[in-house]
Amino acid sequence: MQTKVLCQRDIKRILSVVGRDVMMDRLISEVHAGFARLGRGETDEPPPRTGFARGGDVPGVIEFMPHRASGIGVTMKTVSYSPQNFERFNLPTIVGTVSRLDDDSGSMVALADAATITAMRTGAVAAVATRLLARPGSTTLALIGAGAQAVTQAHALSRVLPLERILISDIKAEHAESFAGRVAFLELPVEVTDAATAMATADVLCTVTSVPVGGGPVVPAEPRQAHLHVNGIGADEQGKTELPKALLDDAFICVDHPGQARAEGEFQQLPDRELGPSLADLCAAPEIAAPHPERLSVFDSTGSAFADHIALDVLLGFADELGLGHKMSIESTPEDVLDPYSL
């Protein structure tokens, strides 16, 4: 069986021809529909991700994120989080690949670069949570962290909110200053500020930082708007948190992956608190979210392999429409399947 391979060139072509707005809108729609199915019990929650922590002079993690859709296939993302990549290697902080295995034969039917769609699906998932939990008509978005993930957070949230301005804060001034150029396509004013001002001013706030383990919080608990909605995105490994516990204590909290939430993410700080409704629960029953847009809410995002599965579906769909990707014989198909040397 041949494998369809989508490389950076193919993904760039999809974004160019289809347009990033259309692709992001499709992702938001499919993520919402998919998580609603998950909340209704029509598909299974993926297992928690696993992997290796890398210490020493080049810290980071390499993780494996699987999801199986029965009768369709298994999506497997291998992803690396390496916070020194930009300075040391001029590479993105998050790099990886995502593959699709046929559910019956186990053969790899697709393989794609995962850096862009990981950033886009993370934004799309946050947009779904924000649409459910943020005050309708929210106009001010604040971002703590001005890296690659901040770009897709701003893009995705601009598709579900009538944003009028973006506040950006980063401990690296050059990243904050360059952010406006990277999101110029949004045609929104961008103001560089500090974390406390961003927190006090925002209707919606996203934390997307590379804060080290034990280095949080990256924002103060107060002052803030009474209706503030927070998307906590960057707490993606054990011991890493971005939000102050005092903020979490006062908030309605929704998690993306209940099986992961206590090992990673902000819920690490709340060992005695019961998990509330998940994002899947809210998508399946939006009335659960209805009381919360006027009060403090937090979406605790650790990253879901189910969202990766959906994102790969969207990517493959656009690739098929445009005739993109190359078929390659990556896997062994010997002339005699009983003889591994008969290649």
Swiss-Prot record:
Superkingdom classification of source: Bacteria
GO cellular component, one term: cytoplasm
Cofactor(s) for this UniProt protein: NAD(+)
Metabolic or biological pathway, per its Swiss-Prot or TrEMBL entry: Antibiotic biosynthesis
GO biological process, one term: antibiotic biosynthetic process
Record flagged with keyword Ribonucleoprotein: no
Broad class of enzyme this protein falls into: lyase
Enzyme Commission code: 4.3.1.28
Activation/inhibition comment: Inhibited by nipecotic acid and thiazolidine-2-carboxylic acid.
InterPro entries named among the record's database cross-references: NAD(P)-bd_dom_sf, ODC_Mu_crystall, ODC_N
Molecular function terms from GO: lyase activity
Signal sequence range: none
Function: Converts L-lysine to L-pipecolate, which is incorporated into multiple secondary metabolite products, including rapamycin, tobulysin, virginiamycin and pristinamycin.
Family: Belongs to the ornithine cyclodeaminase/mu-crystallin family.
Protein name from the UniProt record: L-lysine cyclodeaminase
Organism, as annotated: Streptomyces rapamycinicus (strain ATCC 29253 / DSM 41530 / NRRL 5491 / AYB-994) (Streptomyces hygroscopicus (strain ATCC 29253))
